[in-house]
């Protein structure tokens, strides 16, 4: 490929002679680069040939497809024109149906105002009944407290009565023992008196015996004296008189000692008996006085007990009367609540029926708008490809672009000219949210841009959301779930906003939480947010729908629809149970 001069040949020879010279190395490098470039050129040529073959094949297929599409377009154009005429007829029918529904909505609104007035009257009656019930309950609690106090006093008096009865029984037992002891002492005294009388009789008897003995001795002595000598009679008589005198003195001394001893014993025993009798008499007197005092106290306690029993009976009768009044009030309240629930159920059914009709109308309208837009785009594409002039009705068609605003109702009717000079109108759509809840916390709002989801505590108490989960579901998006932090407490009537990471919000608990692992909550139609408690049971949900407006609507129409929707929401919020609000 390259020619070399004689000098270069010499250089080659010298390079061959010196294998490690720089010239030889550069030549070898150039040779290698040239070989690589040749390989790349061959591959490129092969690739170009392959692409040219594919191009010729694709040209053949394109020609065949153009022939087929031209035939199909001719058939489809006729079919689309027929279906478009049918769609226009259906749109006219839908407009007529909408006018009829607006008239019915006015009637329903009037009926709702009447039901609301009647409901407010029932609520006032219910509040009055509840106030009366609270007053009766407070009076009942007061009477129950007084009854409990009286019963406690009665129990105390009964305990005191039992104690007094026990004391009376003890005193009566002591009195019986004392009486028995006094009786025994009296018997002992009588026995001692009998013994003393017996001793006295024995003493008299011995005196008589002694006197008789003395007389007999004297008689015998006199007899002996007669026999004795008269000379010694005087001496003997004197000695006998002395002996008798001494014997009499000894006998009298013995009698006196025995009498003194007997009197001392009797006096001591009698004194002991008298002391015991006096002591027993004092004890019996004290016992009698104590028994009298106890009887008096028992009578007093019995009278107090009868008085408290009468008061207790009166209070029980009063409690029964209050209980009857309370039962009647409860029955009346139950009947009023049943009537109110029935009316609320009827109102809710009426509103639910109207809402379902409205949703069906919106679904039909949305389907028609989507189908008309699809037909219009296909016809415009075919007209541009076939270079056909658009019809006058097609010049005035509108294409409404869906844009999201925070007002949930988007509208735009400013006309502008596109590049072809045709009049174009931005299409607006409404964002409708439907919610329900069965627990204390509800899903208050869903951002159409997917930036946040807001929860609301509907109660007057703090509520713990430990273990609760907020889940998003969509037909074309994967299911995602956000678990609320541990020990998270939502204050009464407070809101918490859960921001996506892409919204750029600041994490500020407990009012603002940031989901750092999720860029957005998602956008589109039919986005559903559900709130699950710690057991996995669904407590609240909210669904976001996008409803496209009609072509002929003006700003005033959208304003009127927005006003009707706001009134409908406020009326639904007032009439429906707070646990199941419909928006």
UniProtKB/Swiss-Prot annotation:
GO biological process: heterochromatin formation; nuclear envelope organization; nuclear migration; nuclear pore localization; protein localization to nuclear envelope
Entry superkingdom: Eukaryota
Domain LTD, residue spans: 429-546
Sequence segments annotated as region (Linker 1): 68-79
Modified residues (Phosphoserine): 21, 391
Residue ranges, annotated region (Tail): 385-580
Region (Disordered): 1-30, 383-431
Protein's UniProt keywords contain Phosphoprotein: yes
Chain intervals for the UniProt region annotation (Linker 2): 216-242
Lipid moiety-binding residues (S-farnesyl cysteine): 580
UniProt region (Coil 2), positions on chain: 243-384
Coiled-coil ranges from the UniProt annotation: none
GO CC list: intermediate filament; nuclear envelope; nuclear lamina; nuclear matrix; nucleoplasm
Chief localization: nucleus
Keywords: Coiled coil, Intermediate filament, Lipoprotein, Methylation, Nucleus, Phosphoprotein, Prenylation
Function: Lamins are intermediate filament proteins that assemble into a filamentous meshwork, and which constitute the major components of the nuclear lamina, a fibrous layer on the nucleoplasmic side of the inner nuclear membrane. Lamins provide a framework for the nuclear envelope, bridging the nuclear envelope and chromatin, thereby playing an important role in nuclear assembly, chromatin organization, nuclear membrane and telomere dynamics.
Name of the molecule in the record: Lamin-B3
Organism encoding this protein: Xenopus laevis
Species classification: Eukaryota, Metazoa, Chordata, Craniata, Vertebrata
């Amino acid at each position: 490929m390259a020619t070399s001069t004689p000098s270069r040949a010499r250089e080659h020879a010298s390079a061959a002679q010196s294998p490690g010279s720089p010239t030889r190395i550069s030549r070898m490098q150039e040779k290698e680069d040239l070989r690589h470039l040749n390989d790349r050129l061959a591959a490129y040529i092969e690739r170009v040939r392959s692409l040219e073959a594919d191009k010729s094949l694709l040209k053949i297929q394109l020609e065949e497809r153009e022939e087929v599409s031209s035939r199909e377009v001719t058939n489809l154009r006729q079919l689309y024109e027929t279906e478009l005429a049918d769609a226009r007829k259906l749109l006219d029918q839908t407009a007529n149906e909408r006018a009829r529904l607006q008239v019915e909505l006015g009637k329903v609104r009037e009926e709702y105002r009447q039901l609301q007035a009647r409901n407010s009257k029932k609520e006032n009656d219910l509040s009055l009944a509840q106030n009366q019930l609270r007053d009766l309950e407070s009076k009942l609690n007061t009477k129950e407290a007084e009854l409990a106090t009286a019963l406690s006093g009665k129990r105390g008096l009964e305990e005191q009565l039992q104690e007094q009865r026990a004391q009376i029984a003890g005193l009566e037992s002591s009195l019986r023992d004392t009486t028995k002891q006094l009786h025994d002492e009296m018997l002992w005294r009588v026995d001692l008196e009998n013994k003393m009388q017996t001793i006295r009789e024995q003493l008299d008897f011995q005196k008589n015996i002694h006197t008789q003995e003395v007389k007999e001795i004297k008689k015998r002595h006199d007899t002996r004296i007669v026999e004795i000598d008269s000379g010694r009679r005087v001496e003997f008589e004197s000695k006998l008189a002395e002996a008798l005198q001494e014997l009499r003195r000894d006998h009298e001394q013995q009698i006196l000692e025995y009498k003194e001893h007997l009197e001392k014993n009797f006096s001591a025993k009698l004194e002991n008996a008298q002391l015991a009798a006096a002591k027993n008499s004092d004890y019996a007197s004290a016992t009698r006085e104590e028994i009298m005092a106890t009887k008096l106290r028992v009578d007093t306690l019995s009278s107090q007990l009868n008085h408290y029993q009468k008061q207790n009976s009166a209070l029980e009768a009063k409690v029964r009367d209050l209980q009857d009044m309370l039962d009647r009030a409860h029955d009346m309240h139950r009947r009023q609540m049943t009537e109110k629930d029935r009316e609320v159920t009827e109102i809710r059914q009426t509103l639910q029926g109207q809402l379902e009709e409205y949703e069906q109308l919106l679904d039909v309208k949305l389907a028609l708008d989507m189908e008309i837009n699809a037909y219009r785009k296909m016809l415009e594409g075919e007209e541009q490809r076939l270079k056909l002039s658009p019809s006058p009705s097609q010049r005035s068609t509108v294409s409404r672009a869906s844009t999201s605003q925070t007002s949930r109702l988007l509208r735009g009717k400013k006309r502008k000219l596109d590049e072809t000079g045709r009049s174009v109108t931005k299409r607006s759509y409404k964002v409708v949210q439907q919610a329900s809840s069965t627990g204390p916390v509800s899903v208050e709002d869903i951002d159409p841009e997917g930036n946040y989801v807001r929860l609301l505590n509907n109660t007057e108490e703090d509520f713990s959301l430990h273990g609760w989960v907020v889940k998003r579901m969509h037909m074309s998006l994967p299911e995602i779930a956000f678990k609320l932090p541990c020990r998270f407490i939502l204050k009464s009537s407070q809101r918490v906003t859960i921001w996506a990471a892409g919204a750029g919000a600041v994490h500020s608990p407990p009012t603002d939480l940031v989901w750092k692992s999720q860029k957005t909550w998602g956008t589109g139609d039919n986005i559903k947010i559900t709130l699950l408690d710690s057991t996995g049971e669904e407590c609240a949900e909210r669904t976001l729908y996008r409803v496209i407006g009609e072509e002929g609507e003006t700003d005033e129409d959208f304003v009127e629809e927005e006003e009707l929707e706001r009134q409908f929401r406020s009326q639904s919020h007032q009439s429906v149970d707070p646990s199941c609000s419909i928006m």
